Amino acid sequence: MRMDKLTSRFQNALADAQSLAVGRDHTIIEPVHVFSALLDQQGGSTRPLLMQAGVNVPLLRERLTEILEALPKVSGQTVNVSPSNELSRLFHRTDKLAQQHGDQFMASEWFVLAVVDDSGGLGQALRAAGAEKKKIEAAIDKLRGGETVQTENAEEQRQALEKYTIDLTARAESGKLDPVIGRDEEIRRTIQVLQRRTKNNPVLIGEPGVGKTAIVEGLAQRIVNGEVPEGLRSKRLLSLDLGALIAGAKFRGEFEERLKGVLNDLAKNEGRVILFIDELHTMVGAGKADGAMDAGNMLKPALARGELHCIGATTLDEYRKYIEKDAALERRFQKVFVGEPTVEDTIAILRGLKEKYALHHGVEITDPAIVAAATLSNRYITDRQLPDKAIDLMDEAASRIRMEIDSKPEELDRLERRLIQLKIQREMLKKEKDEASKQRLADLERDIEVLDREFSDLEEVWRSEKAALQGATKIKESIEQAKLDLEAAQRRQDYAKMSEIQYGVLPALEKQLVAASQAEQHDFTLVQEKVTAEEIAEVVSRWTGIPVSKMLEGERDKLLRMEADLGRRVVGQEEAIKVVSDAVRRSRTGLSDPNRPSGSFLFLGPTGVGKTELCKALAEFLFDSQDAMVRIDMSEFMEKHSVARLIGAPPGYVGYEEGGYLTELVRRRPYSLILLDEVEKAHSDVFNILLQVLDDGRLTDGQGRTVDFRNTVIVMTSNLGSHQIQELSGDDSPEVYTQMKAAVMEVVQAHFRPEFINRLDDIVVFHPLDKAQIKQIARIQLQGLEKRLAESELKLDLDDRALELLGNVGFDPVYGARPLKRAIQSQLENPLAQQILAEAFVSGDTVQVGVDGGKLVFAKV
């Protein structure tokens, strides 16, 4: 017998049989070794063949083990194993059967048939397990499908559809697919294309997350329920598993063989199967090697002949990039565009999916949560599509509630930690013998007893609440299963089963659920089991950093006293503070225009009056950190070509993949304050980019992605008109300020285009600072010095005369508050640093600062 005349599967089984014989200390390979190896072979056809023929495989497995145990063993020396005479005889019989059926190679099924016909112990065991020659022959005919074995790998190509596809109709029958709500137009269009005589292969095209795969799942459910035209009623919908097709294809041609096997099986089914290829673009180039044919080219003939009835799905970008380039492949498919559903449609979809998600997480999802998931995801998550992003929000919010149910409540956890702490103290006090320690131990025992009782009561409440929730969840699962059984009975037209479920099982379960729900009616103290709009808003806030959640009382008060908080840091600019505060309040209460930035301002005024400082104060107020402010120095964008740095270089230029400076910062932090400092120094083309941001709250970067600016506050600062402000400064009357603002606006209108100025929410002209305000600023700036000294455990005490001196030295109507910083450095910080180095002041001292002879003097208190 020639080994090279066996199929590769049969050769592997023979090698496994040899290993089995060696492992059991047998010197001869008997037919039972080979049969055991064939039965245990991963992906082999022997076990499915026997099951098809009605053989009791577990019983056969037991008989084979008994025969193996009864074989003689040789131990103590290494011997060569060799095939027995009986095995050689069976192989000759197998070879004869293969030749009779026109096979070039011996396949494992002929060995099984030879064993059934044999009078030996193995044949008797097989027949005892229920094997009959006629049934085995019928099963072989069905397995082979009229084909002969002409290649070594012929066995591996069998049952290709079972190996490399997922049966969506079977999954729909067993209720494993989520319900598909809406999308009737797209499903109808898909059915329409499938019913065509030629080019009956639809390809679903749409953005990621709009529900292309869901449409195919909806079609599978309609086929199962018989809600399709006559031509599609008996068809199976299979999804191609490209990963399984490629995995393990080590040698050249192996992938092509597998795909050919799938196509052959489809041809045999004669149009009874529709193949769904998700991510269709992956077929173009799959398996491509030097000189080899890729999967896309292998599909073309089958598509042209009509042997392959196919539905594809891919995104718009990938369709353009891969499919449109291959005109021959593109013309064999008919496009079906899948658009993003509206918010109303998304709400309907979520309502349909609600039960599945509620059952999975064991929580209750309220209707306001569903509406919030659709509306908030549409407004705040702009880089993804509905309904995918709304479903994700609902899923994550439910997961969060489930996690809180399963973990210990905070109150219980705090009590447990306190108990552990007290018990550790008790163990320590037990070692002490004095009376005071004994008294403390007695007090501690009482405290532990009280806390223990409180902890036990709370734990009991928590466990009972949790058990009540779990009971309701189990009943809901039973109801869901009963509904699936009812649908299955309806398809089988089993009316007895239908009436039993509909009028017996379901009403009883629903009665149990009502009873369980009534038990839950009392408010849970420790466990929350409802997903509300507030939970959805919190998830949105976590994802985007945008404060969407309901304002707490503390935040309301904070926003109402915003002017006072900002005024403590920015002195003398009440109008600017009021304008900015109003914009923030509009944004947080949801009254601002949803299609524009929260606020866009142009701050004008001379240097050093607090334009940039107000932005820093605002960033700290909103985000508790100055780092949340996106500061862009516009003097860096004076050249025409530097505009590309803001939105990213165009294709073909260096840095294309890196994205733009402004767009990337806002994509990462959509809720931020953008400060465009010294805006008048930028090139005029920069303002053309800003027009889009100020009007629509969006900007398209160099890679074509839309960046959302609707939750940002945009502040531009400029020194334009500072000369006019200086000329008219000194008199702080409203008339002079109005005159000054008009003069400044003339300069601004001469520099900026009307369409730019017209898009701004407000243009604020800052007031020049007077001496009294400089003194206030000196007090604010000295707070920073006091903090730095506190790190060295030193205190600072300035009298009014010292503060007056610093204010006088630091006052300059032209330069604003900046000279004050220099005055504090030269008059106070420099001499104080020398005194500290000379150890005139050490840790714990208070530095008293006074004035003597027009200079600051230092004394230790």
Curated annotation (Swiss-Prot):
GO terms for cellular component: cytoplasm. Residues 391-525 form a coiled coil. Homohexamer. The oligomerization is ATP-dependent. This is Chaperone protein ClpB. It is found in: Cytoplasm. ATP 1 binds at G206, E207, P208, G209, V210, G211, K212, T213. Residues 3-146 form the Clp R domain. Residues 769-861 are annotated as: C-terminal. Residues 159-340 are annotated as: NBD1. PANTHER family: ATP-DEPENDENT CLP PROTEASE, HEAT SHOCK PROTEIN 104. InterPro entries: AAA+_ATPase, ATPase_AAA_core, Chaperonin_ClpB, Clp_ATPase_C, Clp_N_dom_sf, Clp_R_dom, ClpA/B, ClpA/B_CS1.
